[in-house]
């Protein structure tokens, strides 16, 4: 209805089975299986590892909870898994867990800390905004559809909302919102954010921040008629799935009448977003060359 992609965190040891985790309020519900997870991937959602057992991860269980779980989940969904989501609480964000996440090829880890994420923040401690009917004792704070939105706008932060199973009535009001509350949240994000909202799965956002952090721009030419750049990727981690970037560049006013960009000698349309400012999005690989100018014949040698 709203076009928001979701993200599912999988307890891999119970993939496709009826949930049986301690005294969980969600016991008795069935976990999705591989085919169902593949279906939501085709719908634009994402999938992350929520450990094998949903218990405290010790040094002895790192391989099972992180490596084996990742391998089994990737086989089930026929896609890479780059995100770990801490089960239980931030106990499973301990140093030995995050070190193993890096070792086993994850690109980020999601905590239970209720806070914004900013472009410069550590990607192995991603914060999430809880969408809960109300908080547990002694706080009892009620659901707020505006939670963290205005602060994100002010500080250029990004938000990951999380809930468990938003039905008509929350199964566990300290861990979930209702379906109506989730709809309120979506409506509020769109009304407050307007055209500035980028609705994406975490893998896309992680990829974007990693691409930005590891991109280096080299100026090859900067004349009255042409700007020529080379873009290098410096030590980009292996396995970044999405490799496009959006650029804004200031140019002379005369270049804005019919703006054109050339990426490795291929013409690309650009958009005038403000006076003397062009915007364009392109896939990025190491060493690509970007030319901007008024020459209708393309890049000059």
Q: Where in the sequence are the language-model features?
A:
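Metal-dependent polysaccharide deacetylase catalytic core of the NodB/CE4 family, i.e.
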Residues: 2-97, 103-107, 112-130, 156-169
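A Trp-anchored, charged/polar loop motif used as the substrate-binding/catalytic surface
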Residues: 31, 133-150
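Non-membrane alpha-helical structural segments and their capping/turn regions in soluble enzymes
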Residues: 59-67, 139-142, 176-179, 183
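C-terminal domain-boundary segment and adjacent tail
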Residues: 74, 104-121, 160-239, 249, ...
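C-terminal beta-strand-rich structural cap/linker in extracellular carbohydrate-active enzymes
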Residues: 273-301
